[in-house]
From Swiss-Prot:
PANTHER family: PSEUDOURIDYLATE SYNTHASE TRUB1, TRNA-PSEUDOURIDINE SYNTHASE
Residue spans of biased composition, Basic and acidic residues class: 9-20
EC number from the UniProt entry: 5.4.99.25
EC supergroup of this enzyme: isomerase
CDD domains the record matches: PseudoU_synth_EcTruB
GO biological process: mRNA pseudouridine synthesis; tRNA modification; tRNA pseudouridine synthesis
HAMAP family attached to this UniProt entry: TruB_bact (MF_01080)
Catalytic-site annotation from UniProt: 72
InterPro entries noted in UniProt: PsdUridine_synth_cat_dom_sf, PsdUridine_synth_N, tRNA_psdUridine_synth_TruB, TruB_C
Species whose genome carries this gene: Bradyrhizobium diazoefficiens (strain JCM 10833 / BCRC 13528 / IAM 13628 / NBRC 14792 / USDA 110)
Listed name of the protein: tRNA pseudouridine synthase B
GO molecular function, one term: RNA binding
Entry's family note: Belongs to the pseudouridine synthase TruB family. Type 1 subfamily.
Renumbered residue ranges of the record's region Disordered: 1-33
Gene that specifies this protein: truB
Length: 345
């Protein structure tokens, strides 16, 4: 806060009238604006995913925001943040593949399975490169994985990490996860090894480090972690926080637009077919009404599609039995991605 130039001032009075607080809250909500699109933040180490969403929401002064998959505070890299109507497409990103580059430190197991935890076991043994390479096929494909004790999984309504912090012994059941690719990238010294993993939804890289250490006859934990891919979003889509803040400053002075940082809402829908409709059919779908597919030129696709009209996203829909049934309708009034952002590097 800046200094006060007034030499004398009445004591600040706090208005505890709930109606006044409600009016103030309503004013804040009125001041927020409609912003629709994706921002792929290159999250810095030390920031939680929830904090990152709050920062983006403030920078864009957006009404709604949410992220597509938690990234641990100790990790850096891609955190896709949905603004406005893009929040309706979050599940499509969360179901996509993830790619991580991570460093395992050998010789210690920790209660969190990462460098922030308490050491629970130690070993003097260090795995050889040959032993590590021989192990990798065992962690490729569909495997059974026990999530870390410190995870967001619920046990009888309680988060596992809350129970663990309270000193309770948390027993988590193994669950199937899919690891599409696991490679050894580097071995800087005997104490560390750098890996890259491409995996499906629900995979814990921390558990991967723990289990590899145990099978190699030693212990291991994550000491560095970076996410480089989330669904359709790769490193070329990421924007560091300082660059985003600088863009916001330029936009505030009229030298740029925040739209330049947005990716279109439909970027999250890369893996499903698009279906173009006429303006008349678009009006029906927008009202929540089904549209019949008719004529020789009617599309033959079925299942989930995203519907466009005049090149603009309209709805998520299901196609079947000769009709289009709208499931989620998009209202893209407000700030959206710049036209050129549809073409990505």
């Amino acid at each position: 806060m800046g200094g006060n130039s007034q030499p004398h001032q009445e004591p600040r009075r706090v208005n505890n009238d709930p109606r006044a607080k409600q009016q103030k809250g309503n004013q804040v909500r009125r001041d927020r604006r409609d912003v629709h699109g994706w921002v792929v933040l290159d999250k810095p180490i030390g920031m939680t995913s929830t904090q990152a969403v709050a920062v983006l929401k403030r920078l864009f002064n957006a009404k709604r925001a949410g992220h597509a998959g938690t990234l641990d505070p100790l990790a850096s890299g891609g955190l896709p943040i949905a603004l406005g109507e893009a929040t309706k497409t979050v599940p499509f990103v969360m179901d996509g593949r993830k790619r991580y580059q991570f460093t395992v430190c050998w010789g210690e197991e920790r209660d969190t399975d990462d460098i922030e935890g308490r050491v629970t076991a130690t070993s003097e043994l260090r795995p050889t490169r040959e032993a590590i390479l021989a192990l990798l096929p065992r962690f490729t494909g569909v495997i059974e994985q026990i999530p870390p004790r410190y995870s967001a999984i619920k046990i009888q309504g309680e988060r596992a990490y809350d129970l663990a912090r309270d000193g309770e012994v948390v027993e988590l059941a193994p669950r199937p996860v899919e690891i599409h690719r696991l490679t050894l990238v580097d071995q800087p010294d005997n104490d560390r090894a750098v890996f890259e993993a491409e995996c499906g939804k629900g995979t814990y890289v921390r558990a991967l480090a723990r289990d590899m250490g145990r099978i190699l006859g030693t212990y291991g934990h994550i000491c560095a972690l970076r996410r480089t891919l989330v669904g359709p979003f790769g490193e070329n889509d990421m924007i560091p926080l300082d660059q985003l803040e600088a863009l916001c400053d330029r936009a505030a002075s009229g030298e740029g637009s925040l739209a330049d940082a947005l990716l279109p809402v439909e970027t999250a829908l890369d893996d499903i077919p698009a279906l173009a409709v006429t303006r008349a059919d678009a009006a029906r779908l927008h009202r929540g009404q089904a549209v019949l597919l008719r004529g020789r030129d009617a599309p033959t696709c079925s299942g989930t599609v995203y519907v466009t009209v005049a090149g603009r996203l309209l709805a998520l829909a299901e196609v079947g039995n000769g009709e289009i049934i709208p499931k989620r309708v998009f209202n893209l009034t407000g700030l959206t991605a710049s036209p050129g952002r549809n073409e990505r590097n």
